[in-house]
Regions:
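Conserved ASCE/P-loop NTPase catalytic core
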Residues: 174-343
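Short amphipathic alpha-helical interaction segments
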Residues: 84-100
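A short helix-turn-beta junction within AAA+ P-loop NTPase domains corresponding to the substrate/partner-engaging
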Residues: 314, 354-370
Length: 457
């Protein structure tokens, strides 16, 4: 394949349905990079031995140390080193600098390179000035350059997902081999996915399973520094730390599982930029930055507070060039890496969006159809087993006939919802947990309401 043909194939992407045929684009052999089993094992951030070896200025770190001193009643070199995630020698050098500037004083010795410190009056004055500019006090940040290099190397040297890993990640879903192959291509390539289909047929669950198929872990910093400003990166809601057996690494970084960030109707254009408040006086990374190295799921596209067209236009440059531009409160724009799998899940059609430029940039497209009778039965029986309940296939057949009688289209989520409600009823009536025709009839009415064919509707 020529480079021109390869580029054309990449732009068009691949479109398929869950029950359809997969067309796999060829990849030029010269585009394959060396891959590692677990990039986090190869790109361990080295432990900094000296202050001069850090990628952030000593002056900035000294200011951060001054903001950290008052946080502990018994402040010591060790306590500051722990809070700032720096080595003892570097931390002691920063504190000695503050001592020479008459901002803090030594109150005693705890051990080798470990002293007790206290604030002086000049230190409190300096602290107030610093807090009026930036109130961040926590792990020392890394530079934007270091973050960009680290996240890019890790993501682009990630190995392809194995079929076994993909099958395990999708084990709770019932998908065709074709759909699994497309999802494997999404995971292996890191390209975006446009996931369409009626609501309730597993689009969100499928997107969530993608992150479980991503191999290995990644390193991210707690924070980054740009022009003396701090952007907090680590988020306990989005990032799950994993143990690292080797203690000889830069503790300003944390090893995590590939993150999953989910956003739905609450998404606004403003939430895609740096969040800055006057009270904390530092920035919070936007959701697409927090999802770097993992999966960003834009769920229920078309129901956001901004229009779908505005939102899609915002993503065109990042999807095309793998970079994003964010704006500081000063008006300065900074360039951020855009290294994640973006999944757009929607019940809209491509015709509804009417954005050809955006659709060209979709790596892959997948359509989730309503389940067939066989698939519905398998979903029902499998979920019943997972809840420890026996399910008679005859009961499932009766449910399928009710769909036809009432003019309803089955959804993949219906078996779970009906079984859960049947369990609710058994518990309410203090009956043994089991599925019965009478019980399912009651919860059916409570779940669906009046049939579509009922004249009272």
């Amino acid at each position: 394949m020529s480079n021109v043909d390869a580029q054309h194939t990449e732009e068009l992407g691949v479109e398929t349905e869950l029950e359809g045929t997969v067309v796999v684009p060829a990849v030029p052999t010269d585009s394959v990079a060396p891959l590692f089993t677990n990039p986090a094992d190869w790109f361990v951030p080295p432990f900094p031995e000296k202050l001069e070896g850090l990628d952030v200025s000593a002056g900035f770190l000294a200011d951060l140390a001054l903001k950290t001193v008052p946080l502990d009643a018994e402040c010591s070199t060790a306590s500051i080193a722990h809070r700032m995630r720096l080595g003892m020698l570097i931390t002691e050098a920063l504190l000695q600098r503050l001592t020479h500037e008459k901002l803090i004083e030594i109150k005693g010795m705890v051990g080798l390179h470990n002293h007790r410190y206290a604030m002086l009056d000049h230190g409190w004055d300096a602290l107030r000035r610093l807090m009026s500019f930036c109130s961040y006090a926590g792990p020392a940040p890394v530079s934007l350059k270091s973050y960009t290099e680290m996240i890019t190397q890790q993501v682009r040297n990630r190995p392809p997902a194995s079929r076994q890993a993909l099958d395990q990640a999708m084990s709770n879903l019932i998908l065709s081999d074709y759909a699994k192959e497309i999802l494997g291509l999404v995971v292996g390539s890191g390209r975006s996915l446009f996931l369409t289909g009626p609501s309730g047929n597993g689009k969100t669950a499928t997107a969530r399973a993608l992150v479980d198929a991503l191999p290995g872990e990644i390193w991210i910093p707690y924070a980054i520094e740009v022009d003396g400003q701090v952007i907090r990166m680590f988020d306990t809601h989005s990032h799950l730390p994993v143990p690292h057996t080797n203690d000889d690494y830069d503790r300003r970084w944390v090893r995590i599982r590939p993150p999953l960030v989910v956003v739905g109707g609450e998404l606004t254009l403003a939430s895609l930029d740096l969040a800055y408040t006057e009270t904390q006086r530092f920035y919070e990374a936007p959701l697409q930055v927090k999802s770097n190295g993992g999966v960003l799921l834009v769920d229920d596209l078309g129901r956001q507070r901004c229009s779908a067209t505005e939102l899609l236009n915002r993503w065109i440059v990042p999807l095309e060039y793998r970079i994003d531009y964010l704006t500081l409160s000063t008006g300065k724009k900074i360039q951020m890496p855009f290294e994640q799998i973006v999944v757009f899940a929607t019940n809209l059609t491509e015709a509804d969006l009417e954005d050809e430029a955006f659709m060209r940039r979709m790596g892959y497209r997948l359509h989730a159809e309503a389940p067939s009778a066989e698939t519905y039965t398998e979903i029902f029986l499998r979920y019943a087993r997972s809840r420890g309940i026996f399910a008679d296939e005859n009961l499932v057949m009766q449910l399928l006939r009710k769909y036809q009688t009432e003019g309803r289209i089955p959804k993949a989520c219906d078996p779970r919802d009906l079984i859960d409600r049947a369990i609710d009823r058994c518990r309410l009536l203090r009956q043994p947990i089991k599925l019965t025709e009478q019980g399912l009839e009651v919860v059916w009415k409570g779940y669906f309401g009046l049939p579509h064919t009922d004249p009272k509707r």
